């Protein structure tokens, strides 16, 4: 099993050199003078030590043992509970929460870097505290003062954990047809009845209470998504003094037997007139839940990045050690019986693809986290609105594109190992299994694609897209006369223009038949993802070239950055052409076959 090593050098490069984190924090009033480079690095180093030495050794244990269910009680794998207690002691759950509830009020963009390390070392374990973060955010934004005071201190400290209860057996992506009911009680609370499925971390032994955030319908509520409300439903009631009281009528009916993430309990949760409390206005639950869902979607993008990073680390180590055949251009290790497989172009192609997706994905996720900082803490309404537009556009791209490329990277990891990659003990096939869910939960790739093209681009008449393409255009204009950047800037400029043209073409076709949006959406998302990473790789190449010109002593690191950027532009970015061609194929090839003729 590959042992995870936190890529601190690259994380610091993205935070401090590419995204200028210290300057970013200085522009946000809540963080001015409070968040230095030294403080950020201290947290990163502490998290790296925890993830490398506590979580990584438990990754394969969790996969092998899984969770066990016995009469509604779920037991997590060996070591999970103890690792979680240490996580609490180190203060990581409270990192970005508000101080008045026991939080440290540090930036989300620092928290996302720590989440990357947790996810890369042990994704299944990381889902337990990760979902709590979404619950905290939802209550901070939409809860009443009483609800915040009751639930946030223990959620923030990590003593309690949270869940997101949306899905029902008949209602996954289409939440408008959920059936869980909420009947008003005389005391102002609600009796919640129904069954939710696929609830990650829905029951476990790692915390003394679990706070479920639940979507349900009130009596007489409008049909569809306009009739959904949001509720707090604790596993145990909370006494007036904040202590845990009697058990609520919430029970885990079973846990799923899954392809991957065995260490995380994926639960069927039954609510039998469980007492719940309304969050926000009646029938506005989906609006409130989007706070949780958007947090979860960025978190899932981190899973894609984590898959690329962890599979790259395992494959790289193996490729340097495994001997097979001689290089086609002559022996590279003549003293050995064969050359290391890293000398072979096909192996290098897979390794560089993993590296390009991991490092490009890191830049994208950290950029999103900075925009999230501005949305919450920006000084002016104009700044917050602009950041929210960019964040809204890039979130479906990051969630879908990074999880799909993470899955690709994981498969490359198995392929580099050859037959050994198929053997469980090496741990590479676990990454494939654990990562596959990332393309499904928190909105499938296809749902994210519809969100991007339909809601974020076409419904805004391209306003959000123009905000982002203007950023790319500004970068292109600033560097068009830089000879060293020509190989990056020229193709980026052309594709940036094509992005707008392609959008207009799809929009015109969609005016004739709205199904054209569905036909084009996934390829459009891939097109957008490849360009977005190209923009970030061009920025990284520029920073690296500037450091090399200054005479840095870290020559190898910066040369590798430029070389990987060149690989991305020459070997990965050309994939956009196939997506453009597929979009041009239109709707008819998909819809001309009658449903009854799909036969076997």
For each of these PLM feature ranges, what is it?
Residues 459, 475-600:
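C-terminal amphipathic alpha-helical interaction region
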Residues 133-135, 144-147, 442-444, 452-496:
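A structural-propensity feature for long, helix-poor, extended segments
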Residues 2-5, 184, 261, 367, ...:
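Alpha-helix capping/hinge segments and adjacent helical runs
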Residues 189, 193-247:
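A short core secondary-structure module
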Residues 198-200, 236-253, 258, 265-296, ...:
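A glycine-rich, basic-preceded beta-loop-alpha segment at the flavin cofactor/substrate interface
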Residues 80, 128-132, 143-185, 195, ...:
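Internal maturation/activation junctions in enzymes
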Residues 1-126, 150, 373, 582-600:
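Amphipathic, small/basic residue-rich leader segments at the start of a protein or domain
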Residues 32-34, 65-75, 285-299, 313-354, ...:
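Glycine-rich cofactor-pocket loops
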